């Protein structure tokens, strides 16, 4: 059914941003608003929302997108022109287009009308989706709990006879057994110097050696909400240099988590973590942003980065994941998801060990 409260929130945000009409085509956004899953692939599928609350849906008649109370449905068949259907309902002037809509769809709508001005229209949805309600928070907690179990599973199954890809596939199967719906997404399992590549994908034939770091960056959708968590462990032994790097990253992450509360800039969350690493002499090896939003997608606003001046507000969920990446040597990243509360934040993976000693206890 149509979530009237969420539509109303988006309309209010549209008005605040000076938008009178937006086209919504992002599958997770449509699901968030309607509870309906749409996967049009190359076909056109979109919702038009106006600032008076009027809602239109434009769907191919093959989509099985049933009529919804309060929404005007416009169906088209293969071979018919859906863009004229959309254009006929647009008022002259600015139209907010979905940032994730393929350009062929945007251009095709623009060809139908010469009196509309395309602008980016995803911000009202992004702002509203970033503020999780209680049901969404509970879904994120549940997903994080499964992720915690997957990380522990991975740590306990570290074995020199398993290459990265084999262990990654084992974790993938664990997720699926616990309700995750994966879409050909390999979990990041990185041995040794491969952990120094922030987005290294697990590969066949990469074997484990004593003293290697093992970086697990695991994520999955559970009941339509994502989890995302990273732990770095060391196999059998840990050099003093690697231990030093690990402790710096752990301190940076904790400093950022302690800093999070309503009213702080997301860029300052990044700055707090970055300062710890920079002051320790490793600033040039912190290659990524500090975090990203998580919800119905694994990467969504807000992000904790130097360029993001969004303000942290209650209900926002994002990762805190500083790292140090020493090329051809080691990479250390520690990641947890937090939800902003009224006076700080809730760490969704707070029970999973972060000290080297506690992680070794899990391994053994």
Where are these regions (language model features)?
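Active-site neighborhoods and metal-handling regions in enzymes and metal-associated proteins
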Residues: 1-364
